[in-house]
């Protein structure tokens, strides 16, 4: 963990074995047989005065002062800049419309649900899905606080990186697709009225605008908060060269991710540019420039996931920052959206049921596998670089 060094003056502490005095960030330890001068104060809260003896005592003093620094940093007042506070407020505010809708639906309201929609009689699956997605959006509030409050710096890395990876995966395609779809509609290239009416038989049109507009703000705000946080805490992971090649099993996983990612990229690119083979009659009839944008984003994410995994596994003299960022984004989006679409296609009562073409189901499953393989390579790379906990 990185942090600023803060200078504090500790009181004089006299014990049976020596005297420790700290007035200018210098710890002087006097013993009957040995004298240790320690001027390396680790952390941001100053040094901890202890009676030390010999070289082992000096080492223990450094560890103790580092621990005290972490605790002091967590107790420090919020020094977040004005920009970060604005982004935090935006992220929190952007969750409110979605949380309000989910709360209303769980309470039995039919706001935003048209006549004839399957959501009017949700059943167990939709009830559980509403509760889970509501909890996930509420987690955005916790994540925004964690990225901006002092206590967030001592949260173990996995407890932060897993929800951050999930948020990246779910929000990245929305950030790419939603503005593009609005632009296509504005210039008259959006979906035809029949396709739009089919979408509005599930939810009213305004619900999509409110929900995806909120997700867009959340994605932008969390990106603005996570990037500087990651730079401060884990900047060492992408400094210097990529290094030596990762072990053989990791290389095999990267190669498999690249092969699957390439196949998915070709398939989704074909659909993006107007191809309809494998979509089934219903989806082929609803194909438009808007659905083409979605397919194009899936293609790019799958390719990034696979080939960035290869670059990280191969190592070398190049800096890893670009493949690491692109691989993180691509693998997260490929895994999370592949899993979401697969569950939605197979879940009972969603209107999909057994009508989803096998090619589409295989594509969704391929996204999940590709994302998992690429994420495993990223984890191996970061572990080798000794990512701080």
Predicted regions and their residues:
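C-terminal transmembrane-bundle signature of multipass membrane proteins
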Residues: 99-105, 265-275, 292-389
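Intrinsically disordered, low-complexity terminal tails and inter-domain linkers enriched
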Residues: 1-81
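Membrane-interfacial, low-structure loops and terminal tails that flank and connect transmembrane helices
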Residues: 61, 66-84, 232-252, 389
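Membrane interfacial helix motifs at helix-loop boundaries and amphipathic/re-entrant anchors
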Residues: 102-133, 177-212, 268-297, 340-367
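Alpha-helical transmembrane segments of multi-pass integral membrane proteins
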Residues: 91-104, 166-177, 212-221, 249-273, ...
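Cytosolic juxtamembrane helix at the C-terminal end of the final transmembrane segment
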Residues: 148-152, 223-244, 309-322, 378-389
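Transmembrane-helix bundle segments that line or gate the permeation/cavity pathway
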Residues: 2-8, 80, 84, 88-114, ...
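Membrane-water interface of alpha-helical transmembrane segments
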Residues: 78-92, 120-130, 154-164, 201-212, ...
């Amino acid at each position: 963990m990185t942090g600023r060094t803060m200078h504090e003056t500790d009181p004089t502490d006299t014990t049976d074995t020596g005297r420790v005095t700290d007035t200018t960030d210098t710890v002087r330890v006097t013993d009957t047989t040995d004298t240790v001068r320690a001027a390396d104060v680790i952390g941001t809260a100053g040094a901890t005065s202890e009676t030390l003896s010999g070289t082992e005592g000096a080492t223990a003093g450094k560890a103790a002062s580092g621990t005290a620094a972490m605790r002091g940093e967590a107790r420090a007042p919020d020094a977040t800049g004005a920009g970060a506070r604005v982004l935090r407020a935006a992220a929190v505010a952007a969750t409110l419309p979605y949380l309000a809708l989910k709360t209303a639906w769980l309470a039995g309201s039919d706001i935003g649900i048209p006549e004839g929609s399957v959501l009017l009689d949700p059943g167990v699956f939709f009830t559980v899905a509403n509760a889970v997605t509501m909890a996930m959006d509420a987690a955005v509030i916790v994540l925004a606080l964690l990225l901006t409050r002092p206590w967030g710096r001592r949260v173990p890395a996995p407890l932060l990186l897993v929800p951050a990876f999930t948020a990246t995966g779910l929000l990245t395609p929305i950030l790419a697709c939603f503005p593009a779809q609005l632009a296509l509609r504005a210039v008259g290239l959006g979906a035809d009225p029949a396709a739009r009416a089919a979408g509005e038989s599930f939810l009213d049109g305004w619900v999509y605008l409110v929900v995806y507009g909120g997700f867009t703000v959340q994605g932008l705000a969390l990106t603005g908060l996570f990037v500087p946080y990651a730079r401060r805490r884990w900047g060492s992971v992408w400094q210097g060269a990529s290094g030596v090649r990762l072990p053989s099993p990791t290389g095999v996983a990267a190669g498999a991710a690249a092969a699957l990612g390439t196949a998915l990229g070709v398939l989704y690119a074909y659909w993006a540019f107007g191809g309809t083979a494998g979509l089934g009659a219903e989806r082929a009839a609803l194909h438009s420039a808007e659905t083409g944008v979605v397919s194009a984003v899936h293609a790019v994410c799958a390719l990034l996931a696979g080939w960035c995994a290869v670059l990280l596994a191969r190592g070398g003299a190049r800096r890893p920052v670009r493949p690491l960022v692109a691989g993180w984004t691509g693998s997260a989006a490929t895994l999370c959206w592949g899993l979401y679409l697969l569950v939605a296609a197979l879940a009972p009562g969603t209107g999909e049921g057994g009508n989803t073409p096998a090619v589409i189901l295989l594509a969704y499953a391929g996204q999940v596998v590709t994302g998992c393989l690429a994420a495993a390579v990223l984890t191996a790379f970061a572990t080798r670089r000794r990512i701080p906990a």
